[in-house]
UniProtKB/Swiss-Prot annotation:
Keywords for this protein: Cell membrane, Membrane, Transferase, Transmembrane, Transmembrane helix
Functional summary from the UniProt entry: Catalyzes the transfer of the diacylglyceryl group from phosphatidylglycerol to the sulfhydryl group of the N-terminal cysteine of a prolipoprotein, the first step in the formation of mature lipoproteins.
Name of the featured protein: Phosphatidylglycerol--prolipoprotein diacylglyceryl transferase
EC nos: 2.5.1.145
Top-level taxonomy: Bacteria, Bacillati, Bacillota, Bacilli, Lactobacillales
Gene name as annotated: lgt
Amino acid sequence: MIDPVAIQIGPFAIHWYALCIMTGLVLAVYLSSKEAPRKKMTSDDVIDFIIIAFPIAIIGARLYYVIFEWSYYSKHLNELLAIWNGGIAIYGGLITGAIVLFIYCYYKVLNPIRFLDIIAPGVMLAQAIGRWGNFINQEAYGRVVKALPYLPSFIQKQMFIDGHYRMPTFLFESVWNIIGFTIICYLRRQKKLLLEGEVLAFYLIWYGIGRFVIEGMRTDSLIFIGLRVSQIVSIVLIILGIVFVILRRRQKGIPYYQE
C-alpha cells in the first residue's frame, strides 16, 4: 500500500491527494491562461477567477459529499474537515465553481459562455490528474474482481483492498478524461467547426457519459432515495449539453470558436 502522506515535516503532512489536486489545478490554470488571449480575455481574468473560485469550490465539493453522507458525519463531527482523507465530490465542486463563475463574469463584464469554453479543457485534465489522489487514498474503486493482470504491479497492489482486488474505476475515469481533453483540444483549433459554447457542451456530454457509465461500476457511490447521485447529475449534464448545442445551432449570429 502506498503511504497517503507524501511529505512529513514534523507535525505537518502533505498528502498525495492534495498534491494531485494542486498539480491538476496548476496545469488547468496554465492552459486556460494561454487560451484566454485568443478569446479576447486576459490571463489575469483566469488567475483572478481561480484564486476566488478554487477555495469556494473545495468547500462546495466537501459540503456536497458530507450532505449525502450525513448519516456517517453526524456521528463523526470531528471528521467534517478531514478532506486529506478524501471525501471531495467533483460534482459539488463543479456546481459551486459554476455559480462563482457566473457571479464573477457578471461583475467583471465578461462573457460567461466564452469563459467556460476557455477553462473546460483544463478542468477535464485536472479531473484526470485528481483521480490519482483517489487511487492513493484507496477510494472511488469498483466491484471485486479476481485479478488485475493487465495493469502495472503498483496499481494491482493499491487496488488490493480488504482482501480483494477492486476494479480501478479511478483509472477508467482518468483515461476517459485524458482522451476527452485530447479530442477537444484538437477540435477547438479547427476553423469554423465548433461554435462558441460548444467546447463547454462537449465537456458536459463527454464527462457526463463517462461518469454515468463508470459510476455504475463503483461500490462507494453517494446514494439518495435509492439512486446514485452522480448518475442523476450525469444525465442532467448530458441533456444540458445536447440541448445547448441544438439551441446554439438554431440561433443565428453565434460566432465560431475558431474563425
